[in-house]
Every structure is written in C-alpha cells, then in structure tokens.
Amino acid sequence: MAAKQPPPLMKKHSQTDLVSRLKTRKILGVGGEDDDGEVHRSKISQVLGNEIKFAVREPLGLRVWQFLSAMLFSSVAIMALALPDQLYDAVFDGAEVTSKTPIRLYGGALLSISLIMWNALYTAEKVIIRWTLLTEACYFGVQSLVVTATLAETGLMSLGTLLLLASRLLFVIVSIYYYYQVGRKPKKV
C-alpha cells in the first residue's frame, strides 16, 4: 500500500500580487489617511503616532516672552501685596488710597496667575502654552479697559498712565501674536 503523495503546494507570491498586498494593507489599516491627512507607512507609526505632529514649533522669542511675562506678573504681585500705596500711586499718579484690601487682593490674584506663567515656561505642550498666552492677553486687555474707565471717571491724565496704557496694549498685541504662532499647524516635511 503505497501512500499517495499530496500534490506540491503552490506558494503564492503576495509581494508581487498587487491585489493581495492592497487587501493586506487595508486589513492592517496601513497606507490610508488619518484625520489629519497623514499617510502612515507602517502599523507601528500609526499606533505610536508621528512625533513631529506633537512637537511644538516654537516661534522665535516665545520663551523670552514667557519669562518676561512671568517676571512682570510676579513683581507687580509682590509690589501689590507688600507696597499697595506705592503701586496705586505709580498707576494713578498721586490719587489717595482709601483701602489697601482691594489692592492686596489684586496682588494675590496676580501671584496666582504668575505661578501659572512660571509653570508654562517649562512645558512643551502646545495647549498649555496657548492658554497661558490667551490668559495674559485677556488680563492685559481687561486691565487696559479698567484703567481707561477709571481715568475717564476721575479725569486724572498723566504721562505715566498713558505710558501704562500703551505698554498694556503692546502686551496684548505680542501675546496674541504668539498665541496664533503657537497654534499654527506645522508644515509637512
């Protein structure tokens, strides 16, 4: 009883069979575009992601601006907490302080914002950097409106307060500029 030999198996060359390769890539989910329009070359890059996508392309001078902002917020906060009379006098040029409590509360709020600014200086996360820049722009914008309204009520106008307003508006512009620069999508390489 001779056992009959099975016919030799035909090996399929899937590397050369384009339809088979396409089906395999489709099953693996490789080669198609993701939500951001990126085409992944391998399953590993699809699972792990493309690290370029997560890297923040920092605009020139961003970290210097963050450092200066954190220093400004900290120094004004400390001055408002420790020397409320002098801070009020510097802003409103000779007007009398009726109560130190609101100025000290302002200093406490500024100190809290400055802690956020200091922490944002050491992060690489785009969202955190953008939120701190937006917070800064909103703060300076609101401060400009409050100082303008106070000057309109009191009628006190001096060179110091005009310089303060001009500097605050400049800070708003710079913060918004960096906010949009950090939010830009990186160019495909």
UniProtKB/Swiss-Prot annotation:
**Record's bilayer topology term:** Multi-pass membrane protein
Bilayer-crossing residues are 64-84, 109-129, 131-151, 156-176
Instruction: Enumerate the UniProt keywords alphabetically.
Output: Membrane, Phosphoprotein, Transmembrane, Transmembrane helix
Which ranges form a coiled coil?
none
Answer yes or no on keyword Phosphoprotein. Answer: yes
Q: Which PANTHER family match?
A: TUMOR PROTEIN P53-INDUCIBLE PROTEIN 11
Compartments annotated for it: namely: Membrane
Task: List the record's Gene Ontology CC terms alphabetically.
Answer: membrane
Extracellular side, ranges: 85-108, 152-155
What's the protein here called? Tumor protein p53-inducible protein 11
- Membrane topology (Cytoplasmic): 1-63, 130, 177-189
Residues modified as Phosphoserine: 14
Record's superkingdom?
Eukaryota
Which organism does this record belong to?
Rattus norvegicus
| Database matches in Pfam families | p53-inducible11
Which InterPro entries does the entry mention? TP53I11
Predominant location category? membrane
Which segment of the chain is annotated as a signal peptide?
none
